[in-house]
Amino acid sequence: MAEIKDPENTIVLETTKGKVVIQLFPDVAPGHVERIKGLAREGFYDGVVFHRVIDGFMAQTGDPTGTGTGGSDKPDLKAEFSETRHERGTCSMARTQNPNSANSQFFICFDRAPWLDRQYSVWGQVIEGMDNVDQLKRGEPVRDPDSITSMRVAADL
């Protein structure tokens, strides 16, 4: 396993394809990091599917309804756009056309996606298990989708 230097700011995501370890960026998107950690600690993401997986682009999850239209019961977040680029393994919040509409849905980039830079709130980076993300079933929507089996803050393990 990758060395976890800051367990309080590291997510361990268990999926139907294997483990994914994500380093959080509290200095870049503090509100989004707190939301991700809070929902993970509540078990919100456990059992949630990857409902939208586009080859060469990204894998999206975080909607408890599995449709891409749902979210948590918490208020939407204010955008925290930054200079952090959307690269392979970047974790960023999904949103509607309203920049301040991120809630619980997020995506992991398969490749560089410069059109997302400064338009979506980046909150982390995959540091281990990107090969498992690469194995997620593709589709919009995905038929018989892969899912998150558990999502935890490393400090709690």
PLM feature spans:
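Cyclophilin-like peptidyl-prolyl cis-trans isomerases
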Residues: 1-157
